[in-house]
Amino acid sequence: MYRIKDEWGEFLVRLARRAVEEYVRHKRVIEPPEDTPTELWEKMGVFVTLNRHNVPPQMALRGCIGFPLPIYPLVEATIKAAIYAAVDDPRFPPVQPEELDELTVEVSVLTPPELVEGPPEGRPKKIKVGRDGLLIEKGIYSGLLLPQVPVEWGWDEEEFLAQTCWKAGLPPDCWLDPDTKVYRFTAEIFEEEYPRGPVRRKPLV
């Protein structure tokens, strides 16, 4: 059962696109639209991903920022994440206006992270590539990878754990440390088929 209706997913992708374009072109932060569905004012975690169109998945990423925890109303979090993905992702220079025609927008709405219990060596059996995203925390370090990432890169569960450790700035075997907390979550993902094109629900498998 989906939490996010297809039309809500399309609304969020269009909103994220408008937030990016208005900020990149005019440095203007848009307000949530008056016709925002009531349900999208609920607090939820969300990530916005900007991808270069017609580029292999491993090379397409142009920016991805979001909020793992439900701390903002979804409509507000989507606007914030979209702008941050465009101009504040430390891995990339800010998006320029001339790039906007070549970027597709993807919105991932997250379930709250759930702690993976049990001995560390059993963690790969408790997650599933094609369903789960991962959040890893140890001390001051944390890293998150969305559910679509291991699918796009062809990873198995152990590699997914190792890559999330690396994303957190930790050794790739940190998931075997009992002091490392591993959380899993799922996401409903909506994407433009091409820049400013139709919006579809993205299948993971």
From Swiss-Prot:
<feature type="domain" description="AMMECR1">
    <location>
        <begin position="7"/>
        <end position="201"/>
    </location>
</feature>
<dbReference type="InterPro" id="IPR036071">
    <property type="entry name" value="AMMECR1_dom_sf"/>
</dbReference>
<dbReference type="InterPro" id="IPR023472">
    <property type="entry name" value="Uncharacterised_MJ0810"/>
</dbReference>
<dbReference type="InterPro" id="IPR027485">
    <property type="entry name" value="AMMECR1_N"/>
</dbReference>
<protein>
    <recommendedName>
        <fullName>Protein TK0174</fullName>
    </recommendedName>
</protein>
<dbReference type="Pfam" id="PF01871">
    <property type="entry name" value="AMMECR1"/>
</dbReference>
<dbReference type="InterPro" id="IPR002733">
    <property type="entry name" value="AMMECR1_domain"/>
</dbReference>
<dbReference type="InterPro" id="IPR027623">
    <property type="entry name" value="AmmeMemoSam_A"/>
</dbReference>
<dbReference type="InterPro" id="IPR023473">
    <property type="entry name" value="AMMECR1"/>
</dbReference>
